[in-house]
Regions:
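Binding-interface segments
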Residues: 18-194
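Glycine- and charge-rich intrinsically disordered segments
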Residues: 1-28
Length: 194
């Protein structure tokens, strides 16, 4: 975390989103983000989602912490970049459900962080559709994937049979993760339930 002082709910009471964003302005600038643009993205998201609007009003400290976390990560809330977003949650605090704003990095944001922190060189992901050639082998501890996509047969999401990621470590060594359709359906269902 940065050296910005902790702000309490009492100090945040009555402050609007502009005031809260101004508290982390230096963090945005340090990470190369434009505070004014990020403020617009935050306002658009909060105004478009009644649950986020309520959480920001009831629990402004959670909004502040989420904005601070987004700014410190260097991830933008620009919906076109798909690096991160705010999610409304009901958190149990002292036995009560309290509407809370949570910052959540998206896939592209996580990839950006891993590459920028030099944890990995690259991450490539691909979906596999019904009818495409896909072969996964592990021979003498060496993992390989052969996939021949059919670019003309990728319109229908119902035909997705799985997907994979190739993570290239800084050493140049590839790591593979392969998941079936059921995994993606579970992820989708979990995200819809939040």
């Amino acid at each position: 975390m940065s050296n910005i002082k902790k702000v309490t709910s009492t100090e945040l009471a009555g402050k609007d989103v502009n005031d809260i964003v101004s508290l982390v302005d230096t963090v945005y600038k340090k990470n190369g983000l434009h505070t004014e643009l990020e403020l617009q993205f935050i306002q658009l998201k909060i105004n478009a989602d009644p649950a986020l609007t309520r959480a920001a009003k009831v629990n402004p400290e959670s909004l502040y912490l989420s904005i601070l976390q987004a700014a410190e990560s260097g991830l933008s809330l620009n919906p076109q970049w798909q690096e991160g977003y705010f999610v409304p949650y009901n958190m149990k605090i002292d036995g009560k459900d309290v509407p809370t704003v949570i910052f959540s990095p998206m896939y592209r944001g996580k990839k950006k962080l891993l590459i920028s922190k030099e944890i990995v060189k690259n991450i490539t992901t691909e979906l596999v559709y019904d009818g495409e050639f896909f072969d996964e082998n592990i021979i003498n501890g060496i993992h390989t994937i052969t996939h021949k996509p059919d670019s003309f047969n990728r319109e229908n999401p119902a035909k997705i049979v799985g997907g994979y990621a190739i993570i290239t470590l800084n050493s140049g060594e590839p790591q593979y993760v392969v998941k079936g359709r059921e995994y993606f359906e579970r992820c989708k269902k979990q995200s819809e339930n939040k």
